[in-house]
Swiss-Prot record:
One Gene Ontology term of the molecular function aspect: channel activity
Residue ranges annotated as motif Cell attachment site, crucial for protein stability: 185-187
Similarity-based family: Belongs to the actinoporin family. Sea anemone subfamily.
Name under which the protein is recorded: Deep-sea actinoporin Cjtox I
Propeptide intervals in chain numbering: 20-42
Keywords: Cleavage on pair of basic residues, Cytolysis, Membrane, Nematocyst, Secreted, Signal, Target cell membrane, Target membrane, Toxin
Signal peptide, first to last residue: 1-19
Role: Probably acts in predation. Pore-forming protein that forms cations-selective hydrophilic pores of around 1 nm and causes cytolysis. Pore formation is a multi-step process that involves specific recognition of membrane sphingomyelin (but neither cholesterol nor phosphatidylcholine) using aromatic rich region and adjacent phosphocholine (POC) binding site, firm binding to the membrane (mainly driven by hydrophobic interactions) accompanied by the transfer of the N-terminal region to the lipid-water interface and finally pore formation after oligomerization of monomers.
One biological process term in Gene Ontology: pore complex assembly
């Protein structure tokens, strides 16, 4: 009788092992994409960002212009730092217009900063101003952008200059870059010049009211 009971228990154990399926082992690679999908990275092509200098292109500036909305006078700026130095933002001076973007603070060598500006809504003035960056050699890089409201009287202009010592962008710097320091017309052409202090620049500015300005600063 005991042997019969034991045989019944053994048979029941074998049956349960066969009848119950083994728990499925789903590896990480085999899981549905809804479980394992990676978050989509946001584009870095936005005003206020710092990107690889080699990635700076007009397509990047086009995205910034789009993000600024349907404003008649606006500008997307990209400046590549190939100077061998680190830059730190000082400030922005606006002769006219404004920006919703914080000027990127730290721009290491081989990086480029992106910035956007526009005319003030409801005004009949353009987007005109100066950016200032202090460089690790103790000097300041001043950058002019000028996108006028009335193209019957004015044109697009840009400029770049190295100032000795630490300077802030202000009305004096604007007047110097716009009137006296050999500014470049925004005429859809590349312009190059020596900046002194072992540096040179190469830049391109479009001529329309939705303006792109790309500048590369490198060692001479």
């Amino acid at each position: 009788m005991n042997r019969l009971i034991i045989l019944c228990l053994v048979a029941a154990t074998i049956y349960s092992t066969i009848a119950l399926p083994m728990k499925e082992d789903i590896s990480n690679e085999e899981r549905p994409t809804s479980v394992n999908e990676k978050p989509v990275k946001k584009s870095v092509a936005v005003a206020g960002a710092v990107i690889q200098g080699a990635a700076l292109a007009f397509q990047v500036l086009d995205k910034i212009l789009t993000s600024l909305g349907g404003i008649g006078r606006k500008i997307a700026i990209g400046v590549d730092n190939e100077s061998g130095m680190k830059w730190a933002a000082r400030n922005v001076y606006f002769y006219s217009g404004t920006s919703d973007t914080v000027l990127p603070y730290s721009v290491p060598h081989s990086k480029a900063f992106l910035y956007g500006a526009r005319k003030t809504r409801g005004s009949v003035r353009g987007a005109v101003g100066v950016l200032a960056y202090s460089m690790s050699d103790g000097n300041t890089l001043g950058i002019l952008f000028s996108v006028p409201y009335d193209y019957n009287w004015y044109s697009n202009w840009w400029n770049i200059k190295v100032y000795r010592g630490y300077k802030r962008a202000n009305k004096w710097m604007y007047h110097d870059l716009y009137y006296y320091a050999r500014p470049h017309k925004g005429n859809n052409e590349w312009h190059e010049k020596s900046l002194g202090y072992g540096l040179k620049s190469k830049g391109f500015m479009t001529s329309s009211g939705q303006t792109k300005l790309e500048i590369r600063v490198s060692r001479a």
